[in-house]
């Protein structure tokens, strides 16, 4: 049986379809609650303590961890398009708000929600391209490729946030991620 992605429109070339999902997974993974590459700029601009900013990251991680058991339930309940659009819109809205919200409980809630959308979008993209990566569902091939996507985006987001901070404002990274989504 040949690998196919029926959820993608016919005008998209078949060779490009799985790569679109890998790029979308990278985009979801680049999104974050706060960016450590711009940590000092965030602390200086918002007058928050380092622990407050790190708590944003912990809330993002908690959102991903608590939503993980729900991923397959969501995948089997909703369509691919619905899940990707919802996750993308959530990442877009939360990234636009996170840069400007100063009340910490609301900021932590937004970071938690952004973590849920981040893991949902990444899971949807990577589970759709899994059979393309390894037609026999060999997890010894799939998980290293998944880790390459995750680690690449982690390094990329720190570099990009430091660069955007150098260009002018640490919020540029949030605007960039919102624009990508």
Regions found by a protein language model. Name each.
Residues 105-112:
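Short hydrophobic/alpha-helical segments at membrane-entry points of transmembrane helices
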Residues 29, 33, 99, 115-123, ...:
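Small-residue-rich segments within alpha-helical transmembrane domains of MFS-like 12-TM solute carriers
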Residues 24, 84-90, 94, 110, ...:
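Residue-level signature of the transmembrane alpha-helical cores
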Residues 66-104:
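Conserved MFS/SLC helix-loop-helix module at the cytosolic interface between two early adjacent transmembrane helices
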């Amino acid at each position: 049986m040949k690998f196919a992605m029926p959820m993608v429109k016919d005008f998209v070339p078949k060779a490009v379809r799985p790569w679109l999902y890998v790029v979308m997974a990278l985009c979801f993974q680049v999104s974050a609650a706060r960016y450590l590459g711009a940590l000092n700029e965030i602390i200086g601009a918002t007058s928050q303590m380092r622990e407050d900013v790190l708590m944003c990251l912990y809330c993002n991680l908690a959102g991903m961890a608590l939503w993980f058991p729900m991923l397959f339930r969501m995948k089997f309940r909703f369509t691919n398009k619905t899940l990707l659009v919802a996750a993308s819109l959530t990442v877009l809205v939360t990234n636009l708000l996170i840069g400007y919200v100063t009340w910490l409980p609301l900021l932590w809630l937004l970071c938690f929600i952004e973590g849920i959308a981040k893991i949902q979008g990444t899971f949807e993209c990577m589970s759709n391209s899994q059979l393309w990566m390894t037609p026999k569902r060999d997890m010894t091939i799939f998980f290293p490729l998944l880790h390459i996507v995750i680690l690449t985006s982690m390094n990329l987001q720190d570099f990009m946030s430091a660069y955007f901070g150098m260009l002018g404002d640490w919020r540029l990274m949030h605007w960039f991620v919102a624009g990508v989504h």
